[in-house]
Amino acid sequence: MRKNIVAGNWKMNKTLQEGLALAKELDAALKGRTISCDVIIGTPFIHLASIAAAIDTTRIGVAAENCADKESGAYTGEVSAAMVASTGARYVIIGHSERRAYYHETSPILMEKVKLALSNGLTPIFCVGEVLEEREAGKHFEVVARQVEEALFTLDQTDFAKLILAYEPVWAIGTGKTATADQAQEMHAHIRKSIAAKYGKEVANGCSILYGGSCNAANAKELFSRADVDGGLIGGASLSVDKFLPIIEAF
């Protein structure tokens, strides 16, 4: 049975002190609550070790927002998957549309990141999604399937089964626009069908696919009610416990 997951992505927000306070506040808010999903927070690199040490990581998983596509060496400013794992983080977001757009991350680069994350015991949260022009041209299914195939389909079945996927229609990120629950379901089902064709139904049905793109307390319950939507990758709303908690409780 695949897991329901709500993962926050703080992006480039919060100083170390602010991030630590937010993580502790969320940890305290979840204590004693019965929740029906796994909770993850994706934080900037500088927060990882402090937050992993300060909260109950059986209650909240900690994720990096990126990792390098190289193992180690003379790559000034980069942070390796091994370094991320050494902080106590257990997850890493890979392939977010902002990384693809602003830092020109291609499928071959992302493939290396995924492999290094897996070899260091991290669970990748791999992001895919189309821009508005691609959707309006009717190419959204083709684009998203290609993103999955090019970066991930060299993995063997065992490694692929360790992944979490996140569908984020780029036109809905931070814009206030949201894919309808039916649009999200349609794409998630398409992704699952592509996985089944490559790895079989058992692997496809075991893969959690999250929705990312202006998901909030008002629309989370409807989105999460769809058969192939297994949770959310939450941006802005994850920066406030008051906004993040209702999304967690939408399951």
Swiss-Prot record:
Which GO-annotated molecular functions does the record name?
A: triose-phosphate isomerase activity
Write out the residues that bind substrate.
9-11, 174, 214, 235-236
Mention one GO biological process in which this protein takes part, according to its record: gluconeogenesis
The cysteines joined by S-S bonds are: none
The domain of life for this entry's organism is Bacteria
Catalyses: D-glyceraldehyde 3-phosphate = dihydroxyacetone phosphate
Q: Which SUPFAM superfamilies match?
A: Triosephosphate isomerase (TIM)
Alphabetized, the UniProt keywords read: Cytoplasm, Gluconeogenesis, Glycolysis, Isomerase
Pathway field of the UniProt record reads: Carbohydrate biosynthesis; gluconeogenesis; Carbohydrate degradation; glycolysis; D-glyceraldehyde 3-phosphate from glycerone phosphate: step 1/1
- What are its E.C. numbers? 5.3.1.1
Going by the record, the broad EC class of this enzyme is: isomerase
Quote the InterPro entries the UniProt record gives.
Answer: Aldolase_TIM (IPR013785), TIM_sf (IPR035990), TrioseP_Isoase_bac/euk (IPR022896), Triosephosphate_isomerase (IPR000652), Triosephosphate_isomerase_AS (IPR020861)
Localization (cell): Cytoplasm
Coiled coil residues, start to end? none
Q: What is its main location?
A: cytoplasm
The cross-references to NCBIfam families, in alphabetical order and at most eight, read: tim
Cited PANTHER family:
TRIOSEPHOSPHATE ISOMERASE
Say what the protein does.
Involved in the gluconeogenesis. Catalyzes stereospecifically the conversion of dihydroxyacetone phosphate (DHAP) to D-glyceraldehyde-3-phosphate (G3P).
> What family does this belong to?
Belongs to the triosephosphate isomerase family.
Subunit composition and interactions? Homodimer.
What this protein is called in its record is Triosephosphate isomerase
**Organism of this sequence:** Porphyromonas gingivalis (strain ATCC 33277 / DSM 20709 / CIP 103683 / JCM 12257 / NCTC 11834 / 2561)
Taxonomic lineage per UniProt? Bacteria, Pseudomonadati, Bacteroidota, Bacteroidia, Bacteroidales
Encoding gene per record: tpiA
